[in-house]
UniProtKB/Swiss-Prot annotation:
It is found in: Cytoplasm. It comes from Corynebacterium efficiens (strain DSM 44549 / YS-314 / AJ 12310 / JCM 11189 / NBRC 100395). Its cofactor is Mg(2+). GO terms for molecular function: ATP binding; magnesium ion binding; phenylalanine-tRNA ligase activity; tRNA binding. This is Phenylalanine--tRNA ligase beta subunit. Belongs to the phenylalanyl-tRNA synthetase beta subunit family. Type 1 subfamily. Binds 2 magnesium ions per tetramer. The gene is pheT. It comes from the Bacteria.
């Protein structure tokens, strides 16, 4: 949240006359009570003559492409002559008689923008009539000439004090559990504790903010309002102001506070709602009352209903969205944004102010579903003080009448009561026990009362009722945190805990780390696969309806609407990474990822036990039964070349054999031997897919992806991938160390001709078995096909490494073993030895 230093210090100064603080001290104060500040910055300085001026006359210059105005401005004696200053200006939001801010020649505005006198548009322009953006008070979209009340000062007076340019803007990081602090009211309460100041709640005494409430006491209902129970609306209030000046602009002091809070001034009614929100933390909405027909209904939207929000986007509504309707249709998306049909305009003379307390979960889901985060939704998601509704309505009405005239209707519609806050019991010694610091009972009670709690003392036990704006205080631990936070976390001693026995990585963690290291050493780059996916991916792949991978867990509030299920496979995320890299010009790479996947178990709906007591064994069992199965998977994907062309020779493309080898890398790191078998498993190519087996059980697949899948997904041809279930591999607690021999090895090759349908891995396994105990490794190094071999035949060449642990082998011994391997291959596979 952005907020100006002078605003919070001014609110605190009302009850603490003479108190002042530097920006550095204020920053430390925020941190002291647990708020991080992203930073703070002074309003950029303007040097030289910056004065008040009164526009005496305006000459419209119409001979140019855009409308230009030649103004004569009374700046008193600030220009040294007392004559009216000639200034060219293109802005249209000021008139003769207005008090404006003038930068005279010699002034330098933020951004080193020097002001001088020069001829332009055929006239002499000696100065600039300034906008808020040009003085560093706002961004460009908030730009507009600053107009001030006539009583702001005399022509020629220095404008800096009037504008409050000696100010600093803080960006305070408010955590999700402390929504009350998204307001000047909440932050000043915290700062009062940080600096031991007297605090007066602006909601109880609005004069702290210089605002007099002029709204009459409510007398009767304003209009009929039907709030449906299914919307979970806590409170809903409405008041009306009639007969306002539609062209009235918000005073500069109000616009200034909004601009420094990064809010854009729009019109008087809207500015008032935004100011009340920033001051009290109560989001409001203003309707053009003449555009509301009949009463209002707060209901859930019908699925498929459409609604155009104030940002001129037509939105398809869900049955979970809460809307405010009149007899003609939807007028607002509750807690998020209003609609164009009842928008405040420059013709609005009657205004309905709405202040409500919406269900935080509903607002959060609506905001995410429509990707529409607003200042209002941010506050409702975190919780808004339900007791603030009446004050917010009266303040908004009073401010609007002060700015734009009109009268406040005596009627007020108010639905819902302020909820009773549940009490919390806590031993007064509990903060001391947890922190290891002695806090007196008086200190504990005082700190809780500073927060706004009502505290009753009964011996050594406190009964605490949290204030309505602190819905995050639900248990004793929350109260302990408040005491520790306000007393200072730096007072808690730092003690290194004694490490428990058996520390270190578990065997499963060691295996996961070993697999990651092995794949990285093999040249694969690691990515972190997304835990979410689009279920339509399975349709692109052509999976059967009963495929296990379609057994997904649906996410109720997904970060992205189309990625609304938990991933049952890592490949969608891996292939998305391939697509992104290829579209950005990178075509040769191989990636790996290790991540849990999730399969739905039971009906996928878990109970919601109370947090006030430990759940029973039955509830715990029910919770565990509904948790998804989350096995750990590893996946690799490769495209383009794995070996690059250069002076050393031609390159080599990443093939299905490399994908299979990546599976072997995983297995070796886990101390497991894989078996391979032909497989027909989408999204892989049926003729280039291998099933990965351990003890006869399929644990994964590897190979080249199906050409149609690649085409539909916009991926390069011949892209290959592997995915394996790591948790399905037997866990080897102690991997055997390799046996090293001091004796030399013998290398021999063997080439076998087999049918095209016989897998190379099957041949390799038979050769290894037939070669006996003397063979250390059997590796395929060549696959050959030709007319001489015959149709449907292929030649597989293997390199055999022989070694004996206790002697030097002879060539004859190695040759006997090689021939034995060939004989077994002939017997089992019909293989014929070549050459």
């Amino acid at each position: 949240m952005f907020i100006a230093q002078n605003w919070v210090t001014g609110l605190l100064g009302h009850s603490n006359p003479g108190w002042s603080v530097t920006s550095e001290e204020l920053d430390a104060g925020y941190v002291r009570v647990g708020f991080e500040t992203e930073g703070y910055a002074a309003i950029p300085a303007t040097t030289g003559p910056l004065v008040l001026g009164v526009v005496e006359s305006i000459e419209e210059l119409t001979e140019f492409k855009k409308p230009i105005r030649h103004c004569f401005v009374n700046v008193g004696q600030a220009n040294g002559t007392g004559e009216n200053q000639s200034i060219i200006c293109g802005a249209r939001n000021f008139a003769e008689g207005d008090t404006v801010v003038v930068a005279l020649p010699g002034a330098v505005l933020p951004g080193d923008f020097a002001i001088g006198a020069r001829e332009t548009y055929g006239r002499m322009s000696a100065g600039m009539i300034c906008s808020a953006a040009e003085l560093g008070l706002a961004d460009k979209q908030n730009s507009g000439i600053i107009t001030l009340p006539a009583e702001s000062g005399q022509p020629g007076d220095d404008a800096r004090a009037v504008l409050g340019l000696d100010d600093t803007v803080f960006e305070v990081n408010v955590t999700p559990d402390r929504g009350y602090a998204l307001s000047a009211r909440g932050l000043t309460r915290e700062l009062a504790s940080a600096f031991n100041l007297t605090y007066t709640d602006v909601a109880e005494d609005t004069r702290v903010a210089g605002i007099e409430l002029t709204a009459p006491e409510p007398a009767g209902e304003l209009i009929d309002i039907d709030v449906r129970e299914e919307t979970n609306t806590v409170r809903f209030g409405l008041r009306k102001v009639s007969g306002i000046d539609p062209n009235a602009e918000s005073p500069f002091w109000l616009q200034r506070e909004l601009m420094l809070c990064r809010q854009r001034p729009v019109n008087a009614a809207t500015d008032v709602t935004n100011y009340v929100m920033m001051l009290l933390g109560a989001p409001m909405h203003a309707f053009d009352a003449t555009k509301i027909t009949g009463g209002l209904t707060v209901r859930n939207a019908q699925p498929g209903e459409k609604f155009e929000t104030l940002d001129h986007v037509i939105r398809d509504l869900s049955g979970e969205d809460v809307v405010i309707c009149d007899e003609t249709g939807i007028q607002s998306m509750a807690g998020v944004m209003g609609g164009v049909t009842s928008e405040i305009s420059n013709e609005t003379t009657e205004v309905y102010f709405e202040s409500a307390i919406w269900d935080p979960k509903t607002v959060a889901r609506t905001s995410r579903r429509h990707k529409l985060s607003s200042e209002a939704s941010r506050r409702f998601e975190r919780g808004v003080d339900p007791a603030i509704v009446e004050v917010a309505l009266d303040m908004a009405c009073s401010l609007l009448v002060e700015i734009a005239g009109g009268t406040i209707d005596a009627g007020r519609t108010l639905i819902g009561e302020v909820p009773t806050m549940p009490s919390i019991t806590m031993p007064v010694s509990r903060p001391s026990e947890l922190a290891g610091v002695e806090y007196s009972p008086e200190t504990v009670v005082a700190r809780l009362e500073e927060v706004g709690c009502t505290v009753s003392v009964n011996g050594d036990v406190l009964t605490v009722v949290p204030p309505t704006w602190r819905s995050d205080l639900t248990m004793a631990a929350d109260l302990v945190e408040e005491v520790l936070r306000l007393e200072g976390l730096e007072a808690i001693p730092t003690i290194v805990p004694t490490a428990p026995a058996g520390r270190g990585l578990s065997d499963a963690q060691k295996r996961r780390r070993a697999i990651g290291h092995a794949l990285a050493y093999a040249g694969y780059a690691e990515i972190i696969p997304s835990p979410f996916m689009n279920p339509e991916t399975f349709d692109v792949w052509g999976l059967d309806a009963d495929d296990e991978r379609r057994n997904t867990v649906t996410v109720l509030n997904p970060l992205e609407a189309d990625s609304n299920v938990l991933s049952t496979t890592l490949l969608p995320s891996m292939l998305d990474a391939v697509r992104r890299n290829v579209t950005r010009g990178t075509g040769d790479f191989s990636l790996f990822g290790v991540q849990q996947v999730s399969f739905e178990r039971g009906n996928g709906v878990s109970p919601m036990p109370s947090v006030k007591q430990r759940p029973s064994a039955e509830v715990v069992a029910e919770l565990l039964d509904t948790l998804p199965e989350q096995p750990l998977h590893a996946a690799t994907v490769g495209t383009g070349n794995i070996e690059f062309e250069g002076p050393w020779g031609s390159g080599r493309a990443y093939t299905y054999a490399d994908a299979i080898e990546s599976a072997r890398i995983v297995a070796r790191a886990a101390g497991i031997e894989l078996e391979l078998a032909n497989a027909d498993e989408l999204p892989w190519h049926p003729g280039r897919c291998a099933a990965l087996l351990v003890d006869g059980h399929v644990v994964g697949h590897a190979g080249e992806l199906h050409p149609q899948v690649l085409e539909r997904a916009g991926l390069p041809a011949r892209t290959c991938a592997m995915e394996i279930n790591i948790d399905a591999l037997p866990l080897r607690e102690n991997l055997p160390a390799p046996v090293l021999s001091a004796f030399p090895a013998l290398h021999q090759d063997i080439a076998l001709v087999v049918d095209e349908t016989v897998p190379a891995e099957q041949v390799r396994a038979v050769v290894e078995e037939g070669a006996g105990e003397l063979v250390e490794t059997v590796e395929l190094f060549d696959v050959y096909r030709s007319e001489q071999l015959g149709e449907g035949k292929k030649s597989l060449a293997f390199s055999l490494l022989f070694r004996a642990p206790d002697r030097t082998l002879t060539d004859e011994e190695a040759n006997v073993a090689r021939l034995a391997a060939a004989e077994l291959a002939k017997e089992r596979l019909g293989a014929e030895m070549r050459g």
